[in-house]
C-alpha cells in the first residue's frame, strides 16, 4: 500500500486497480460454476449466457465495492473481515436463496431488497430457468447498479491517503 500512496493517483484509480483482478477471478468462478452445473446436474440454460455474464459482472462489482468500502473504513484487517461476515449471512438468508422470499415476514423482505444478492438470484433464475431477456431482468439490475454506485462512492469518499 505504501507504493500506491507514493504514486500520483486518485482514489478512484486505486480502487479500479485493486478491483479489476478480482472481477476477473469472479468471472472465472462463474464460468466454472456454470460448466460444472451443466455437466454434473444438467442445469438448463434457456436464456442468453452473454446477458448472464454481463448481469453477474455488475453483481461481482457490487460485492467488490462493498469489500473496498469495508477496507477503507475499518481500522484493521480483522475489523474489515468482521464487517464482511456481518453482511454475508443476512444477504444470503434474506435473499431467497435458502427460504422462499415471499414466505418471509415483510420486514425481512424489505431488508432483503437492499442486498444485491436478492436481485442477482432473481436474474440468474430468470435467465437460466425462464429464458428472460434484458427487458425482464432490467428491474433487477438497477438496484444492483444503485447499490454499487452508492457503496463505491462511500469507498472513494472514505479512502485515506495515509497509513495512519
Regions found by a protein language model. Give the residues of each.
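Hydrophobic alpha-helical interface/terminus motif in multipass membrane transporters
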Residues: 1-4, 36, 40, 70, ...
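Alpha-helical transmembrane segments and their short interhelical loops
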Residues: 11, 15-85, 89, 135-141, ...
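Membrane-interfacial helix-loop-helix junctions in multi-pass membrane proteins
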Residues: 44, 96-150
Amino acid at each position: 500500500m505504501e507504493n500506491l500512496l507514493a504514486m500520483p493517483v486518485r482514489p478512484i484509480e486505486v480502487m479500479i486497480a485493486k478491483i479489476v483482478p478480482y472481477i476477473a477471478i469472479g468471472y472465472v468462478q462463474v464460468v466454472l460454476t456454470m460448466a460444472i452445473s451443466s455437466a454434473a446436474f444438467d442445469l438448463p440454460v434457456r436464456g442468453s449466457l452473454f446477458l448472464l455474464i454481463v448481469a453477474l459482472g455488475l453483481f461481482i462489482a457490487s460485492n467488490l465495492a462493498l469489500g473496498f468500502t469495508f477496507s477503507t473504513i475499518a481500522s484493521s484487517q480483522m475489523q474489515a473481515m468482521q464487517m464482511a461476515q456481518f453482511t454475508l449471512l443476512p444477504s444470503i438468508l434474506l435473499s431467497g436463496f435458502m427460504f422462499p422470499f415471499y414466505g418471509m415476514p415483510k420486514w425481512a423482505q424489505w431488508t432483503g431488497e437492499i442486498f444485491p444478492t436478492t436481485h442477482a438470484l432473481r436474474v440468474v433464475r430468470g435467465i437460466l430457468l425462464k429464458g428472460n431477456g434484458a427487458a425482464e431482468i432490467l428491474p433487477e439490475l438497477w438496484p444492483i447498479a444503485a447499490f454499487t454506485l452508492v457503496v463505491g462512492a462511500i469507498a472513494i469518499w472514505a479512502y485515506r491517503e495515509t497509513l495512519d
